[in-house]
């Protein structure tokens, strides 16, 4: 079986991965988490005039939600609206298709890093297979969630940052990271760790970090303008997120868990015993290859 897989061409692997993603866009229904619908799709529904502001959740009224993802869906579906397409189920599929296509493209683009990390072609293939053919990968990629969009943008930005040499490429990486941040604020942390890796382990030229930081700032500026489009007034959603969750204490209602709880979730929600292998290999990699960029990503 392993020999047969090693003989499969990259083209067939790409087509197989694309097929699984398209399959997932059609057979996925509903939402994985309430936020995926009520804080993205319903915000979009407001712009289309299908719902009133009073019907939206408290996150809208407290202005803690960035509008970047909703803005993308709005303009990408505008031509269909002009053509008279009104079926909400079609739009649900369409947004899954767009998000899934971006996620698939990000993992395909990840081959640039795999080829620099592994010189043997069969190892490159197995890296691609793990990224694309684990049962949860296509499902996660097609979700219209902030997690899915932000991870795809983050991968594009990180791959450009780690593989390109031109200064403009670092600026583009920063733009993608800035939009990653506007898709999901928490993604600022992995971006910071890529910077730490570049600064302390690779000892890259500080100018490259500055160019990427400028890209982040420009993207944040665009994101702030998009929030104005969404809320109808100037608003800095990150501040409101911090204010409501950490000063006013709304976050307390969602429960607390220690960091190591993610390990337990990974084991029990990732379908044992395969999840035990995945978690074990990940922890082993962090310990044995702590200087590798993948550890810092």
Label for each model-derived stretch:
Residues 1-23, 214-216:
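Start-transfer (signal-anchor) and selected internal transmembrane alpha helices
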Residues 22, 26, 135-141, 157-161, ...:
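Membrane-interface alpha helices of multi-pass inner-membrane proteins
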Residues 101, 114, 122-136:
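Transmembrane and membrane-interface helices of multi-pass
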Residues 93-119, 156:
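Transmembrane-helix motifs of polytopic, lipid-linked glycan transferases
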Residues 20-26, 37-64, 68, 72-83:
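Extracytosolic helix-loop segments that constitute the early lumenal/periplasmic catalytic or substrate-binding loops
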Residues 105-112, 130, 136-137, 149-175:
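Specific aromatic-rich, kink-prone transmembrane helix
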Residues 180, 185, 190-280, 293-297:
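Membrane-lumen/periplasm interface segments of specific transmembrane helices
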Residues 33-35, 139-149:
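Short acidic/glycine- and proline-prone juxtamembrane loop motifs at membrane-interface regions
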């Amino acid at each position: 079986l392993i020999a047969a897989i090693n003989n499969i061409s990259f083209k067939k692997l790409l087509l197989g991965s694309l097929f699984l993603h398209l399959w997932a866009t059609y057979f996925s229904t509903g939402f994985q988490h309430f936020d995926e619908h009520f804080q993205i799709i319903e915000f979009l529904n407001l712009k289309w005039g299908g719902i009133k502001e009073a019907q939206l959740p408290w996150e809208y009224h407290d202005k803690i939600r960035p509008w970047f993802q909703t803005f993308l869906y709005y303009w990408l579906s505008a031509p269909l609206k002009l053509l008279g397409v009104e079926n909400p189920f079609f739009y649900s599929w369409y947004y899954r298709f767009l998000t899934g296509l971006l996620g698939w493209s990000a993992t395909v683009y990840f081959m640039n890093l795999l080829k620099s990390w592994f010189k043997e072609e069969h190892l490159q293939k197995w890296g691609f297979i793990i990224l694309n053919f684990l049962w949860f990968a296509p499902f996660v990629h097609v979700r219209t969630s902030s997690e899915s969009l932000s991870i795809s943008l983050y991968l594009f930005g990180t791959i450009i940052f780690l593989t390109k040499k031109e200064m403009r490429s670092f600026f583009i990486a920063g733009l993608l990271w800035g939009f990653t941040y506007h898709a999901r604020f928490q993604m600022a942390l992995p971006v910071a760790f890529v910077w730490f890796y570049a600064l302390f382990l690779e000892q890259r030229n500080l100018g490259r970090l500055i160019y990427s930081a400028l890209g982040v700032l420009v993207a944040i500026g665009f994101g702030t303008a998009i929030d104005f489009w969404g809320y109808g007034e100037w608003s800095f959603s990150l501040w409101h997120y911090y204010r409501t969750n950490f000063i006013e204490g709304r976050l307390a209602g969602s429960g607390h868990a220690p960091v190591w709880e993610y390990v337990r979730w990974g084991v029990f929600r990732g379908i044992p015993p395969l999840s035990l292998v995945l978690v074990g290999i990940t922890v082993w990699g962090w310990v044995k290859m702590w200087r590798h960029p993948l550890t810092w990503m």
